[in-house]
């Protein structure tokens, strides 16, 4: 507890659960071992720990092997790795919702991991080269996604397995007197992916813990880089990336609301949802002047296809059925019609830098000024997320859903790039 905002103490109880259980019910306690003499929860003061207290322990061992050889114009490499991952949770509080499954050490999750990768490059002559890379890997899930609700209990996520990753890349390089070029394409496929989120779920007036499992993902794209040597001191570079990073199927979901001790299973209709908060298309042009100790660079960058983090709760099967055809959750044929993922606004950004190196009698002085977003374009979205709040309310008597006055889906949280900003760096070497 950092600041009680004027209060003297705070009861260590689950305030979300008070709407479901009475204040004296042990299930509202965050720690049954410190409920106090009246059973109202330990009094928390500034500097105390409350709500949850746990440690996640990970033990990992890896062994690598690598072999490389050059035969004429062919250079190739083969590498392999095997590993072992062990993880478990140690709870320092006995949660009232999970009295027998929150304090102490959890069960262990063990994963045998490993993978192989290879790369081959053929020199074709005349500055041309062709490369191919392939890889396959079994990777243990991250510890921060392995537990279903770590703030409340020791449960691991159901269907927790190694992620399986196939990767491939094909590239062409050219190096000449006035031009250097690189063209590459890649395709990666992942299965058994597990993702985890926790957030305040307005529909249930509760904090919620969401685990999505059995996910499949595709990552693919093309990249082009050109470097033109216009003169001995002037270069022009053109860079372009078009990529795709999205879910290939609808995920299984299990979630727990902090007002109850029961899990809910469903399908989240998140197929074709994209990776968030990164531009999937980037195009750049850079002009560089380097002469007589001067360094001047002017860079123009265009960013596009920037998606916000999607809210799984808006795409649960149960949510779409509740919305029905009247509120757009299903079409007339009974097919689910989940929301499209919210996309942020891209745009153009101009950056510049100028520097000078001076050689002195007893050292050297380097001065560099960098200015970002020279045109002060603050309309570019750098990231954000959809609100996990539905656009309807449900009549508890009739079960009918009606539209809310405020449309949460159309008003997501967005982050924007900073306006014009700069940095001056002065370094003296001796």
Describe the predicted segments one by one.
Residues 73-76, 127-130, 178-181, 233-236, ...:
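Repeated loop/turn-to-beta-strand initiation elements of outer-membrane beta-barrel proteins
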Residues 5-14, 88-97, 143-151, 193-202, ...:
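Outer-membrane beta-barrel translocator domains and adjoining extracellular loop/strand segments
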Residues 108-109, 138-191, 200-229, 268-281, ...:
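Outer-membrane beta-barrel signature, preferentially recognizing the C-terminal barrel domain
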Residues 63-69, 82, 118-122, 170-174, ...:
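Residues on the lipid-exposed face of transmembrane beta-strands in outer-membrane beta-barrel proteins
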Residues 302-330, 345, 356-430:
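C-terminal beta-signal and adjacent terminal beta-strands/loops
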């Amino acid at each position: 507890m950092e600041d009680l905002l004027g209060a003297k103490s705070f009861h260590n109880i689950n305030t979300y659960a008070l709407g479901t259980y009475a204040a004296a019910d042990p299930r509202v306690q965050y720690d049954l071992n410190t409920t106090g003499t009246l059973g109202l929860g330990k009094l928390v003061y500034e500097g105390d720990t409350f709500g949850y207290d746990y440690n996640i322990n990970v033990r990992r061992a890896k062994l690598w092997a690598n072999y490389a050889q050059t035969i004429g114009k062919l250079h190739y490499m083969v590498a392999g790795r095997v590993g072992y991952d062990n993880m478990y949770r140690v709870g320092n509080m006995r949660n009232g919702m999970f009295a027998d499954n929150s304090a102490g050490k959890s069960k262990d999750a063990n994963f045998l991991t490993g993978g192989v990768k290879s790369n081959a490059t053929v020199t074709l002559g005349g500055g041309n080269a062709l490369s191919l890379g392939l890889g396959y890997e079994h990777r243990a899930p991250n510890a921060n996604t392995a537990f279903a609700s770590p703030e409340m209990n020791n449960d691991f996520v159901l269907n927790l397995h190694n992620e399986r990753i196939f990767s491939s890349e094909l590239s062409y390089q050219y190096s000449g007197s006035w031009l250097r070029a690189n063209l590459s394409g890649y395709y990666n496929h992942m299965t058994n992916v597990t993702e985890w989120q926790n957030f305040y779920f307005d529909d249930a007036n509760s904090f919620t813990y969401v685990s999505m499992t059995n996910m499949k993902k595709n990552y693919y794209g093309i990249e082009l880089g050109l470097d033109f040597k216009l003169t001995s001191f002037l270069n022009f570079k053109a860079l372009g990336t078009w990529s795709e990073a999205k879910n290939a199927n609808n995920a299984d979901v299990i979630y727990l609301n902090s007002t109850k001790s029961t899990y809910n299973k469903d399908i989240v209709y998140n197929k074709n949802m994209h990776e968030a908060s990164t531009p999937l298309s980037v195009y750049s042009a850079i002009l560089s002047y380097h002469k007589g100790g001067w360094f001047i660079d002017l860079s123009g960058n265009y960013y596009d296809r920037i998606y916000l983090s999607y809210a799984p709760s808006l795409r649960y099967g149960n949510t779409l059925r509740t919305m029905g055809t009247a509120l757009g959750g299903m079409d007339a044929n009974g097919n689910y019609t989940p929301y499209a993922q919210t996309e942020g606004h891209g745009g153009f950004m101009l950056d510049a830098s100028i520097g000078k190196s001076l050689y002195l009698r007893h050292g050297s002085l380097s001065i560099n000024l960098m200015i970002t977003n020279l045109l002060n374009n603050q309309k570019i979205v750098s990231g954000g997320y959809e609100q996990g709040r539905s656009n309807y309310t449900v009549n508890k008597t009739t079960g009918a859903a009606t539209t809310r006055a405020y449309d949460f889906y159309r008003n997501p949280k967005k982050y924007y790039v900073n306006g014009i900003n700069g940095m001056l760096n002065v370094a003296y070497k001796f």
